[in-house]
A protein has these predicted regions:
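Gly/Pro/Ser/Thr-rich low-complexity, intrinsically disordered segments predominantly at protein N-termini
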Residues: 1-180
Length: 180
């Protein structure tokens, strides 16, 4: 029997895929495909985006961007986080390849993305030293907060807080507001 070698996906291969409404990413050569998000996902994402925009207006430490995006983390990984804050030194970049310094990455979990967001991509974000990663679970009404060296998440159930080292003030958001 002839064995076929598994495909190792590259960022270039992912960029060449058709724009068909699916989200395509690759992490260490594994292709991740997720369908369009649910309404709840988008509602939570909008509330979080609004709160972060207000915070970044007060604390101009970087720029908030959303997917679709092509964020390369290493030669074999291309991700599209739901929301991410780019450090001020990369703010204003005109090409995705120019974005190298992320302060915050946010994934709002969907049933189809839980494994990728909570294990595969979380480990990737940690290994690349992204200071803070939020896995937002609208169904459980919690946010897992991960940092690069953490073995376990801090699970926020009431209030989400974020204080980048370059910021003078604290970001705070009541989870009852986020999940209203």
């Amino acid at each position: 029997m002839h064995m076929v070698a598994p495909v190792v996906w590259t960022p270039e291969m992912v960029r060449a895929l058709p724009d068909d409404g699916q989200r395509y990413e690759t992490v260490h050569g594994e292709l991740l495909v997720t369908p369009a998000p649910r309404v709840t996902h988008q509602r939570v994402l909008s509330r979080l985006l609004t709160a972060l925009v207000r915070y970044l207006d007060r604390e101009p430490i970087g720029e908030l961007l959303t997917s679709p995006a092509d964020i390369s983390l290493g030669d074999d990984s291309l991700v599209q986080p739901d929301l991410f804050v780019v450090d001020a030194q990369d703010a204003g970049a005109t090409a995705w390849a120019d974005i190298k310094h992320l302060l915050l990455v946010v994934e709002v979990l969907s049933p189809s993305s839980v494994r990728a967001d909570c294990t595969v991509k979380r480990a990737l974000y940690q290994s690349h030293g992204i200071p803070t990663y939020w896995a937002v679970d609208a169904d459980a009404r919690v946010v897992e907060v991960w940092t690069p060296l953490a073995d376990h998440a801090v699970v926020e159930r009431e209030r989400l807080r974020w204080r980048p080292t370059v910021a003078a003030s604290l970001f705070e958001l009541e989870l009852t507001t986020l999940f209203a």
